[in-house]
């Protein structure tokens, strides 16, 4: 189904760039999941080429299995409808064991592979930070930052709007967000929300 045109006897998993650690992580995962004889861990060559491979597959109606991440503008495009594949749940002990093998392969090449463990990538959370002085001097801004939360899908959509529709205009993208979403109203006092809405 995901035939590798360079080796039609195998499928192709479009992976990371070979200089990125995720390329080697994906190689180990392919081996751990028993797919080493069935799929190649394909290096698309660059981040732009990875995006083009995904967008091209969707444009042509062709199947693709690939590594990717969010948030990105590509994932916000309405024509891109990716499904995250299920892997064993993230487990730190397993991940640490796998990373020992990943680092050996990075140092000594693919022949350094040895059976270990594999599971899904850990979802990362962003941490909001401010200096103590700034926080003490700007309680209203800190209250806003504490209340501010936005879903990954909305960030994807806004990034796509920024790249594809606003011409790279951050202010236009912010206005588009404010005009088309309402969750921001809970981040500010009601009178501030009313003033913002009246100015849109």
Model segments located where?
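A conserved helix-loop-strand patch within extracytoplasmic ligand-binding domains
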Residues: 1-16
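Short, solvent-exposed loop/turn segments at the edges of secondary structure
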Residues: 8, 123-124
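Ligand-binding pocket segment of bilobal, Venus flytrap-like solute-binding proteins
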Residues: 12-98
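Extracytoplasmic/periplasmic, Sec-exported soluble proteins
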Residues: 14-18, 42-49, 118-120, 133, ...
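An extracytoplasmic/periplasmic, membrane-proximal ligand-sensing/linker region
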Residues: 23-37, 47-61, 140, 144-200
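Extended, charge-rich low-complexity interaction segments
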Residues: 71-80, 115, 124, 154, ...
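Short beta-strand->loop
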Residues: 77-120, 133
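A bilobed periplasmic-binding-protein/Venus flytrap-type ligand-binding module shared by bacterial periplasmic
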Residues: 124-137, 160-161
């Amino acid at each position: 189904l995901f035939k590798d045109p360079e080796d039609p006897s195998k499928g192709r998993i479009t992976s990371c760039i070979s200089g990125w650690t995720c390329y080697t992580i994906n190689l180990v995962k392919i081996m751990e999941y028993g797919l080493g004889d069935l799929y190649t861990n394909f290096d698309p060559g660059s981040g732009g080429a990875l995006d083009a491979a995904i967008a091209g597959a969707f444009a042509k109606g062709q199947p693709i299995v690939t590594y990717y991440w969010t948030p990105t503008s590509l994932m916000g495009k309405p024509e891109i409808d990716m499904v995250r594949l299920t892997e064993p749940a993230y487990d730190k002990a397993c991940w640490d064991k796998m990373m020992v093998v990943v680092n050996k392969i990075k140092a000594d090449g693919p022949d350094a592979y040895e059976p270990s463990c594999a599971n899904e990538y850990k979802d990362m959370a962003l941490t909001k930070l401010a200096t103590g002085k700034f926080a003490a001097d700007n309680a209203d801004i800190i209250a806003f930052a504490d209340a501010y939360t936005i879903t990954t899908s909305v960030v994807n959509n806004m990034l796509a709007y920024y790249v594809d529709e606003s011409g790279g205009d951050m202010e236009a993208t912010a206005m588009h967000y404010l005009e088309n979403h309402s969750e921001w109203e809970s981040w500010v006092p009601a009178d501030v929300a009313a003033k913002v809405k009246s100015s849109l």
